[in-house]
Amino acid sequence: MTAGHGVSHSEEGTGYRGQLHGVQLWVAQPDHTRHEAPAFEHRADLPQVELDLAVATVVIGEFAGVVSPARRDTDHAGIDLDLRPGRSTIPLRGDYEHGVVVLTGACTIDGADVTPGHLAYLGVGRDQITLTTDEPTRALLVGGVPFDEPVLMWWNYVARTRDEITTAHRDWTEEAARFGHVNSHLPRYEIGPPPWRPQ
């Protein structure tokens, strides 16, 4: 989903009662695309590559010579790693800052334990990492060129200035057309004004 100047959506169950795992990532859009109309795309067949004991699904961006068809407005990547027990060397781009989130199982990165559900920040300048697991593990590798524009976020609003967030909140509260309309049995979420401190 690409928010552009604003988007609404509903997250509703399907009746499935098994266990689900999900990760929601927000990527700030660059100034030249953040005022465009919102968009949505569904990609059922994402490319994969095998590395040592890992199967890597390229959700977005490029990884190990494989390119996802998903839209991206900045130079970044998101890779779903399905790790079998053992050691896997994962290539990285040195100009990216990276992070790894362990979703299920457990692993170490270059010998350091990673707490499941937390982001292990790897910074810029690495060309590879070694992931070691004693059990089947699922992890998400994210990375990208450091963003060189200021970004503010409050609730679901992502902007560059307080004024933009205040305007977005007013438009949401007044149900302005910029956010669109969602036909859903769920109630529309209401939120109070931003708690700005005086400047």
Residue positions per predicted region:
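Jelly-roll (double-stranded beta-helix
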Residues: 1-199
